[in-house]
């Protein structure tokens, strides 16, 4: 299983998810979508099956 750190910040009406190891980011409309959006981004970027992607919440800024 691949594990990645994420940093999440509030940006207006969106949540911005930063994935430092990949130098990328994605956005979620609702907090409940953050984990899925991060895992999807990582899976696509690394060509790893989504069920093999784990995330570690490093920082969450409201």
Predicted segments — roles?
Residues 2-21:
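Short aromatic-glycine-(Arg/Gly/Cys) micro-motifs in beta-strand/loop hairpins
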Residues 1-7, 36-62:
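Short, charged, surface-exposed hinge/linker loops at domain edges
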Residues 19-32:
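A short, exposed loop/beta-hairpin motif centered on an aromatic-Gly-Thr core
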